[in-house]
Structure formats: structure tokens, C-alpha cells
Amino acid sequence: RDSSTSRGLGDVYKRQDRAYSTSIFNAGSTVGALAAPITIPPLARYFQSIGVGNGWEMAFIVIGGLGFIWMGLWMFLYKKPNVNPRVNAAELEYIEQDNNNPEESKAQQAAANDFDNKKISFLQCFKFPQTWAVFVGKFMTDGVWWFFLFWTPAYISDVYGFASDTGTAQMLIFVLYAITMLSIYGGKLPTIIINKTGKNPYAARMQAMLIFALFPLLALFAQPLGNYSYWYPIIIIGIAGAAHQSWSANIYSVVGDMFPKSTIATIVGIGGMAGGIGSFCINMGSGRLFDYAAETNMTFMGFEGKPAGYFIIFCVCAVAYLVGWIIMKALVPKYKPVDA
């Protein structure tokens, strides 16, 4: 999904608008998470009532089938702007502003077009620091998102005693996901920075990502404030989730700033692989830490047992984005397309 969509956005949006458009498609997963609790259980109960197994199997098949329907629509309806009859002349002119900049000579425009058409093999991608910047940015941060996604229901149950099927727990999760929808506005920030400062898209994105990297620091206070109300950690996790989605939208757009269009999907795929590795590490490590904390009644910063384990992971999540940003900035200090 991420690879193909990022490649498509590279065709239909100019550079300064890509982060905003990416934040919109990124928010789709949040909409799905909000819709899942009110659609999948009723479907499962219906299929169970008519004797189709336990109901859950067919419910998942139906939901998964929607993805194939969307894939079919994409394959038949998507066309590049220059051959799409639904794109008018004014829209096409706006989209192609990056390629038709009046301040650039014809030679510069030709060089830019040649760059976008260059082919880079999968293995060659790893010789560029830009690739490793994306790799590190995804490795350090995707695991935080998936930790919050997978472990928050368990956190609510372990710390506050609300089972995931109770109304209170479902309301807390709903509010958390609703807050993450704020990420749509985060995708707009680089455009605002570009318009106000005249910075190049890469510099504007890195400035925006630094701002987004500061919000997860609030996770340091989630556990202590949770002593007063369970709403505090939920709101903080929601804000951190919104910051992650804004960060993610911009890191996808950074790929389009530095790599040829023909290579965008490959680099996004490499970033996705890095994010998967990071997610595996933090989720497996968290599970083992929580088991150890419960078995040994471990103490940390005034917390005992599993709450101590959660506080440790919250601390890791809080600083992950800032560490990732620093490494990315060290690898690619200034805007520099790959020397393909």
C-alpha cells in the first residue's frame, strides 16, 4: 500500500503538497481502526447466526475482500495526470509546476526530467546515505506506532482493569484513534513553512519532523499522570499517535524529494521493511519485559510489576523520534538528491 500510494502521489502532486496528501491517505488506517469495532463484531455475529462457522472467519474474509475491490478500482481508474481525461488543463499545469519552473533553464528542466527517469537497482539503493536516513527514520519510529496500536488495550486492562470488550475500554480506544486524526493537519505544516520562509521542501519537512518529534516526549508523563485519571495516558498516546502519522507522512515525502520517481516505491518499501523490523523488536521486547516485570515484581521510578515495564517502554517511545531525527539529519544535513 505505502509503496504504490507514495509512487502515485509523486505523479499527481507537486513536492510541497505531497506531505499533506500523504497525511490524508495515512489517516485512512485510523478511519479503519475507528470503524472496525462497530463493523466487524456485528458482521461476525450475523454470520454466526446463519451458521457460518464462528462468524469471525467470514467477517475477516468480507473485510479483506474490500481490499481486492479497491485494488480493482485503482487498476482501472488510476491514470497519470497527463493522460487522465478527468484532469483539466489548469490542474495539469499546477501539478507540473515542478517540471515547468520558469526560473529554470530548459537544460535544468531536462536534467530534472532525466533524473526522475533514472533507474536504480535495489542493491544500489543501499549505497546512498539518503536510503539509510529513511531506513533509520522508519526503524526508530514505526515500532512506537505499532506498540501503541497493539499494546494499549492490554495497558488499559493491566493497569486499570478494563477488559477490551467493556464499554469503557472501547470508548478509550475510540477517543485515542480520534485524536490521531489530527495528523491530517500535520501534513500541511511543511507547505506553510515553505510559503512563509521560502525553504526547499526537504528543509521544510525536516523542520516539521523536528516539531513532530517533540510531541512524543509527552509519553514520559503518561504513566505518572495515569495515577490521577486513565484519560491522561489515553490523550497523550493519541497525541503521540497523531505526531507519528504526521512524521510518517513527511518521511514518505522526503523520499520523493531525494530519489527519482522511478525509485520512490523501492525506497518506501525499504523503509517499510525497516519499520517492520523495528516493530518486531519493540513488540517482542515489550512482551518479554512485561512478563519479566510481572514475575519479578520489578520496580522502576516508583512503579511496580507490569506498570514499571510499561513506563520503561513509554520512555523508549518518547525519545525514539528525536533520536531518529538526529541520525537522519546527520546522514543528510542538507537537501541533496541521490547521485544516481
Label every model-predicted segment:
Residues 2-9, 13:
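Single conserved hydrophobic/aromatic residue that forms the stacking wall/gate
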Residues 123-187, 244-248, 252, 279-287:
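Extracytoplasmic gate region of multi-pass secondary transporters
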